[in-house]
């Protein structure tokens, strides 16, 4: 998704009640990471990243600890599922979910699409080739400066860890690499002792499209319904 869409999405997230919307999604990511790789962050890079992202959203330590403990309980019986859909104006949508009840999740998603004329869920794999999967890391520019590193120094240091692109956006530095380089890039940040502000695996459209304000307003109604579902932890579109 393009920067304009991300700006609107960021503005929407600020309006969310974190306890009711953001925290449950972050908790699911922590629980699944602990379930897959163990409850010790020192030996589980995926869990370290999930905790890092939770702390970036000011999630309380008690909530984080509870999410880790949940991995060994019946509540921790989560699975990762991806669904794909299409909407009007050529909009393509990929929804990454974490759920303990896939039947409930797909039923809810179908209801959102059914309420939107011209929108539909499509078979998995139909849209995969329209997106590139990337590892995306964010850090603060002043943290780089504190290490007495220039952007060129940082880029050179992380190339061997899988860096493909470095971008400066306001007070942040965004690092992108191949999807399979996520663990390696994480190790690169750790080797530099550079704090990570946020880390994620993202899907970036190969051919983004632009919508006018009216089209965007109509499309956002569907996207808002999807994002508000607790089982949906990430949403990607081809909107520029």
UniProtKB/Swiss-Prot annotation:
It is found in: Cytoplasm. It holds the Pfam family TACO1_YebC_N. InterPro entries: Integrase-like_N, TACO1_YebC-like_2nd/3rd_dom, TACO1_YebC_N, Transcrip_reg_TACO1-like, Transcrip_reg_TACO1-like_dom3, YebC-like. GO terms for molecular function: DNA binding. Gene3D superfamilies: 1.10.10.200, 3.30.70.980. GO terms for biological process: regulation of DNA-templated transcription. Disulfide bonds: none annotated. One of its GO terms (cellular component) is cytosol. Keywords: Cytoplasm, DNA-binding, Transcription, Transcription regulation. Its main location: cytoplasm. PANTHER family: TRANSCRIPTIONAL REGULATORY PROTEIN YEBC-RELATED, TRANSLATIONAL ACTIVATOR OF CYTOCHROME C OXIDASE 1. Belongs to the TACO1 family. HAMAP family: Transcrip_reg_TACO1. This is Probable transcriptional regulatory protein HP_0162. It comes from Helicobacter pylori (strain ATCC 700392 / 26695). The lineage of its organism: Bacteria, Pseudomonadati, Campylobacterota, Epsilonproteobacteria, Campylobacterales.
């Amino acid at each position: 998704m393009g920067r304009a869409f991300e700006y609107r999405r960021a503005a929407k997230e600020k309006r969310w009640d974190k306890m009711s919307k953001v925290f449950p999604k972050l908790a699911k990511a922590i629980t699944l990471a602990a379930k897959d790789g163990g409850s010790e962050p020192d030996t589980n890079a995926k869990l370290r990243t999930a905790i890092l992202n939770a702390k970036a959203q000011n999630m309380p330590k008690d909530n984080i600890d509870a999410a880790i403990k949940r991995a060994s309980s019946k509540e921790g019986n989560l699975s990762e599922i991806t669904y794909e859909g299409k909407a009007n104006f050529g909009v393509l949508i990929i929804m990454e979910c974490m759920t303990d009840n896939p039947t409930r999740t797909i039923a809810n998603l179908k209801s959102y699409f059914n309420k939107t004329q011209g929108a539909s869920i499509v078979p998995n794999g139909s849209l995969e080739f329209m997106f590139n999967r990337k590892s995306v890391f964010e850090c603060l520019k002043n943290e780089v400066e504190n290490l007495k590193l220039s952007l060129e120094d940082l880029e050179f240091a992380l190339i061997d860890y899988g860096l493909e692109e470095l971008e400066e956006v306001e007070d942040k530095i965004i690092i992108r690499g191949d999807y399979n380089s996520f663990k390696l890039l994480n190790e690169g940040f750790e080797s530099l002792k550079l704090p990570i502000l946020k880390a994620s695996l993202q899907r970036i459209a190969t051919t983004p499209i632009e919508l006018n304000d009216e089209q965007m307003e109509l499309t956002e109604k569907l996207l808002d319904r999807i994002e508000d579902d607790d089982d949906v932890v990430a949403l990607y579109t081809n909107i520029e």
